[in-house]
Regions:
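Catalytic active-site module of serine/aspartate enzymes centered on a nucleophile-bearing elbow/loop
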Residues: 302-337
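Conserved HGGG/HGGXW glycine-rich cap/lid loop of the alpha/beta-hydrolase fold
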Residues: 35-83
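Short acidic-hydrophobic surface loop/beta-edge motif
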Residues: 22-26
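Flexible "cap/lid" subdomain of the alpha/beta-hydrolase fold that forms the substrate-access gate
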Residues: 17-18, 29-31, 43, 79-115, ...
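Active-site helix-initiating loop/hinge in glycosyltransferases
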Residues: 49, 92, 318-319
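Signature tryptophan residues that serve as conserved aromatic anchors
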Residues: 50, 54-57, 119, 125, ...
């Protein structure tokens, strides 16, 4: 908690914005949130991805709050200071979108702009399908809007990758990836946060897919130094939190693909009419298998795609000034009522 407060405070030291950290009971769980900005400002919810925390938005919170938005950034369920339910089905997309709606209810707001990264982007893109009346705008970072597949994601991945290794399939077996990551949280996080870029050589790419008993972390390159966007204090904060909580809650998000497929079979809205923005990085390995060319099958309202040259997966931490500029420009066009 102390590191968390100090980390956010460092980013806000030159502003008049004072963030508030509090616990909120919503949708059957307790979420730790960081909140900043005027209480009567338009609400913007920042939803982080795997393996991150509300802390991953440390560069966006002050910029958005200073622009007059009421910013709410939760540690999502399974992470950080928030509840970590034991049942795997407690992490399905119905529950995850329900958490964001619960934060809106707690804030007394009818609608919000949802901004998500990685898994948080999946939740952000799904919320206007399940709760269309609560979403004024939606932005996804690193994961674009994609149509519901004909079969569950895991079925498609098994057909595509066969006996090859693929991390999403490896994450399916409860306890396996958990044990690997929990054994050395610092090594796990340093490799995931520091090594998740599009491989520059074919051997590295093939290693990520090679069959065998080797786990996920061992396949990632070990960076010889931290990336420029990640300080030693930043890494220490992530390590402290995941050392305390473990990775099981976070990994349980991946174990609900089949449930999510069922839940999204009959959405309240078939498409997204709210203004939408996707921002990706040209060096993001996730975009090698998550294509951006089917967005218009999902989004029928105003839509814009931005690709940042040379950016990797952790885009809001890597390119904070560019991301902030894009988000502020996008939000300035939103009709909030």
């Amino acid at each position: 908690m102390e590191v968390f407060r100090h980390g956010i405070a460092l980013c806000l030291a030159l502003t008049v914005i004072t963030p508030i950290e509090r616990l909120v009971d919503v949708n059957g769980v307790r979420l730790r949130i960081v909140e900043a900005g005027p209480p009567n400002g338009p609400v913007v919810i920042l939803a982080h991805g795997f393996p991150e925390l509300a802390y991953s938005w440390r560069h966006q919170i002050p910029a958005l709050a200073a622009a007059g938005y009421r910013v709410i950034a939760p540690d999502q369920r399974g992470y950080g200071g928030s509840s970590r339910p034991e049942p795997i089905d407690a992490y399905d997309i119905g529950q995850l979108t329900g958490d964001l709606v619960g934060l809106l209810d707690d804030a007394g707001a009818e609608r919000a702009a949802l901004i998500g990264h990685d898994w948080g982007a999946v939740v952000a893109w799904t919320t206007p399908l399940l709760h269309p009346d609560r979403v004024a705008a939606v932005a996804g970072l690193s994961v674009p809007p994609v149509p519901r597949p004909l079969t569950p994601v895991t079925d498609a991945l098994r057909r595509i990758f066969g006996n090859s290794f693929f991390y999403m399939l490896y994450f399916q077996q409860p306890g396996v990836a958990d044990a690997e990551m929990n054994a050395d949280p610092r090594r796990s996080l340093q490799r995931m946060l520091g090594g998740m870029r599009a491989p520059q050589d074919e051997a590295a790419a093939l290693r990520m897919l090679a069959p065998g008993l080797e786990g996920f972390i061992d396949r990632l390159p070990e960076p010889d130094r931290l990336p420029d966007w990640l300080t030693a204090d930043d890494l220490d904060h992530y390590v402290a939190e995941f050392s305390r909580t473990g990775f099981t809650g976070a990994l349980n998000w991946y174990r609900n693909y089949e449930r999510n497929w069922d839940i999204t079979a009959h959405p309240v809205a078939e498409t997204i009419s709210a203004p939408s923005l996707f921002i990706g990085g040209t060096d993001d390995p996730v975009l090698a298998f998550t294509k951006t060319d089917r967005a218009r099958e999902v989004v029928v309202g105003p839509y814009r795609q931005v690709m940042l040259d040379g950016a990797g997966h952790w885009i809001q931490q890597e390119r904070p000034e560019q991301i902030n500029a894009e988000l502020l420009g996008f939000l300035s066009q939103v009709h909030w009522r």
